[in-house]
Amino acid sequence: MSRVKRGVTAHARHRKIIKKAKGYYGRRKNAFRTANQAVEKAGQYAYRDRRTRKRNFRALWIQRINAGVREHGLTYSRFIDGLAKAGIEVDRKVLSDIAIHEPEAFKALVEQAQAALK
């Protein structure tokens, strides 16, 4: 059996990691071992924060809806309860967008929610 020298494969693997570490500070960008650790840690942060981003956006939408609803004398939780009782199924992302860009339509939704609460 012939001898397998891994120089080409190893070099390609190192090059791939160094390329991913482009823009990092200090040795992290050009020393393979530290670059490898930095790239792996970056991947862990990215994985974690892709999930955190979903929570952050939901919280932002809720804050925007709450601000819009309070202008009409209602709280967020009462508004959501009113929408559910009125049978209006609109998600928070859309409600947030309506509250910002279409105040008249949002006011109509608030009035429907208030009517359903009574």
Swiss-Prot record:
The keyword Cell membrane does not apply. Pfam families: Ribosomal_L20 (PF00453). Belongs to the bacterial ribosomal protein bL20 family. One of its GO terms (molecular function) is structural constituent of ribosome. Binds directly to 23S ribosomal RNA and is necessary for the in vitro assembly process of the 50S ribosomal subunit. It is not involved in the protein synthesizing functions of that subunit. It comes from Parvibaculum lavamentivorans (strain DS-1 / DSM 13023 / NCIMB 13966). Keywords: Ribonucleoprotein, Ribosomal protein, RNA-binding, rRNA-binding. One of its GO terms (biological process) is translation. It comes from the Bacteria. One of its GO terms (cellular component) is ribosome. InterPro entries: Ribosomal_bL20, RIBOSOMAL_L20_CS, Ribosomal_protein_bL20_C. This is Large ribosomal subunit protein bL20.
